[in-house]
Amino acid sequence: MTATLQQRKSANVWEQFCEWITSTNNRLYIGWFGVLMIPTLLAATTCFIIAFIAAPPVDIDGIREPVAGSLIYGNNIISGAVVPSSNAIGLHFYPIWEAASLDEWLYNGGPYQLVIFHFLTGVFCYLGREWELSYRLGMRPWICLAFSAPVAAATAVFLIYPIGQGSFSDGMPLGISGTFNFMIVFQAEHNILMHPFHMLGVAGVFGGSLFSAMHGSLVTSSLVRETTENESQNYGYKFGQEEETYNIVAAHGYFGRLIFQYASFNNSRQLHFFLAAWPVIGIWFTALGVSTMAFNLNGFNFNQSIIDSQGRVINTWADIINRANLGMEVMHERNAHNFPLDLAAGEVAPVAISAPAING
């Protein structure tokens, strides 16, 4: 018996590196998008953690009134945030080397730009990496398409909205209460709750939660029995098994009788496409709505829409919302504005019909 050994062709270092980067046998797939994703997300995460803990107050409004956002300046997990860069910086790109000193960079909120630019680059690459891994494995490319919804939402609040408003100080703060403040001010200035695209987003998120719960409960309730009463029903499934683990006919029959026949899917592929598409399309619309409101194409305004025969206003819920919006608007940036923009931009009201004569 003769044994033959075939020597593998020796590849150069670059080819070995390329093979390792694109290998689907690694525990975690890297990919070419991962080459950029890993350092950018690490930079964003590191800067965020340091800034959240120790960043000095930031002059967010550009009026020399710094706002503290870090833990060591008295905040907690709920109130803390990485404060957006100063209104004095506006839309200027503000890396560390553009500042005269590190203290100036911190005072003007430089860490915020560092975090959001690296974060957005990282999530864009994560989306590309999802497509890349699907391509390597011969899968269809819809996973990255689904992830494009939260990517679009993040891009809208961190990039498109500040561009439309003319300053990164209008971007969403990187913290819990800062996010709520952003939402309240957004409602006050843009009436987002009355925007149809936001309504579609609410339907997408709440509807997606409802459909997910309905699907999960129907599947769990129609599992094919494979275990005894004394065992966990989870032991009835073996990873990779060819048989269906639940009875879709039973689930279809139950739901069709609970609502009506055509409210229930009888095709598993159509069902799962619907479960993916509903929330994704809804969040797409919300991101599109925020991106249009960034340029002040705001929600519907039905203020003082109903009047009686004498011309007197009959208040509706739209007028209640308008009053709430004005209240929220006068509370934010209280030292940067004398009046809310809606009041300051109105026509000048005369305070006297004629000036009195002055006899000296």
From Swiss-Prot:
The chain crosses the membrane at residues 29-46, 118-133, 142-156, 197-218, 274-288. Tyr-161 forms a radical intermediate that is referred to as redox-active TyrZ, YZ or Y-Z. C-terminally processed by CtpA; processing is essential to allow assembly of the oxygen-evolving complex and thus photosynthetic growth. It is a multi-pass membrane protein. Chlorophyll a ChlzD1 binds at H118. Pheophytin a binds at Y126. The keyword Metal-binding applies. It is found in: Cellular thylakoid membrane. Keywords: Calcium, Chlorophyll, Chromophore, Electron transport, Herbicide resistance, Iron, Magnesium, Manganese, Membrane, Metal-binding, Oxidoreductase, Photosynthesis, Photosystem II, Thylakoid, Transmembrane, Transmembrane helix, Transport. It catalyses: 2 a plastoquinone + 4 hnu + 2 H2O = 2 a plastoquinol + O2. The record marks H190 as: Stabilizes free radical intermediate. Fe cation binds at H215, H272. It comes from the Bacteria. The keyword Lipoprotein does not apply. GO terms for cellular component: photosystem II; plasma membrane-derived thylakoid membrane. Pfam families: Photo_RC. Its EC number is 1.10.3.9. Photosystem II (PSII) is a light-driven water:plastoquinone oxidoreductase that uses light energy to abstract electrons from H(2)O, generating O(2) and a proton gradient subsequently used for ATP formation. It consists of a core antenna complex that captures photons, and an electron transfer chain that converts photonic excitation into a charge separation. The D1/D2 (PsbA/PsbD) reaction center heterodimer binds P680, the primary electron donor of PSII as well as several subsequent electron acceptors. PSII is composed of 1 copy each of membrane proteins PsbA, PsbB, PsbC, PsbD, PsbE, PsbF, PsbH, PsbI, PsbJ, PsbK, PsbL, PsbM, PsbT, PsbX, PsbY, PsbZ, Psb30/Ycf12, peripheral proteins PsbO, CyanoQ (PsbQ), PsbU, PsbV and a large number of cofactors. It forms dimeric complexes. Belongs to the reaction center PufL/M/PsbA/D family. This is Photosystem II protein D1 2. It comes from Nostoc sp. (strain PCC 7120 / SAG 25.82 / UTEX 2576). The lineage of its organism: Bacteria, Bacillati, Cyanobacteriota, Cyanophyceae, Nostocales. The gene is psbA2.
